[in-house]
Amino acid sequence: MFSRPALTRGQPAGSSPPAQRGFAAVASPKASYEPATIAGVKVASRDDSGPTTRLAVVAKAGTRYEPLPGLTNTQKRSALRITREAELLGGQLTAYHTREALVLQANFLRDDLPYFTELLAEVLSQTRYTTHEYHEEVENVIHMKQAKLDASAIALDAAHAVAFHTGLGEPLYPTPSTPISSYLNEYSVAAFAEAAYTKANIAVIADGASEAGLSKWIEPFFKSVPAESASSISTTASKYHGGEQRIPKTGSNSVVIAFPGAALGANQPETSVLVGLLGGESTIKWSPGFSLLSNATAAAPRNFAYSDAGLLTVQISGKASAVRKVAEESVKALKGVAAGGVSQEVLVKAIAKAKFNLLSASEVSGTGLVHAGAKLIHGGQPLKVAETIKALEGVTAEQLQAAAKTLLEGKASVAAVGDLHVLPFAEDLGLKV
């Protein structure tokens, strides 16, 4: 039942001023990660005093340096015990890899920081790589991931391969035809883990924990992580090559058009704005969208930022005839930018989109954890959010025009997967490879 004051029964209509709608205040962006070194371990944290925490160990152990599996048994806990204890605490454990990093991440209630800090330290220093576990679990997981590879994933890997050859050109997951049994076993995995899991190669990133809280638990639990290893991770500087690769496949089609992009920490805000400008789909339900590719079928521009290189891609997936048409439109749109066809109105929208992409990637998907860790393990500093936003706001139409011209004048990396009778060659698109 409504209270009497809420009903205001009998009150004259004009006795109070009419309600007025106001604009909501602009929310401040989340604080940047603050770096520190605790007991020889590179750490970065930010604390919004919320009820939950995300804690991640980012190791320099991605496919660029050779792949390896994630969470498994440790000397103190079995995989089953780890799972059951995490469930009892309401936590979530995930392990995944990128081209440069292996990420062990835990999401949990704030008060459970001691348990999950100890658990992640155990995984680094006390994991047991058993023969039966490798053959019964790890091999099966690899085969399942190989079976799930679609044209989009294969095309993206192929574009990286022609762009960088080795290193960043290694696929995220090997294709079914890759002879992995000749190279991969429980001993090679254990040897790679020994080289990768050292204090010099890892960073601990926390979102929702204070530096003081981290220091209290990292110091005792991570002291068992070795400072260095007898063997080391092989690192070769990335070199962009460009080229073309075509792979026949039934059932699905995908084309990736790629160019040199912005590396992590590079002062190239125009690249992010160019991604926002190209867009690919409308983000508003009843609007056709402002982006140059908003009417395209499944066209997805993105800048893949790595420690010493970047790859700006436009990926198009769908029916072969539609993919060909949209690939042509994508290059046409980029040429339009190079010719100076960006209005002030569209530029403002593209900058706003770039700012949203930056902030949402950090807050929603957890990309900020990985990027902060990747920067630390490669000797850099975490992203400064306020400074980056200011740089995005300063991008001009002339900068976008110059960036687009530079891309088109250089060598592209083009990958086509699917019906090769229909899918275009780079030459058909007017691109140099």
Residue ranges and their predicted role:
Residues 2-17, 81-236, 294-433:
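Charge-rich, well-structured scaffold segments of protease-associated domains
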Residues 1-85, 190-291, 413-433:
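His/Glu-rich zincin catalytic helix
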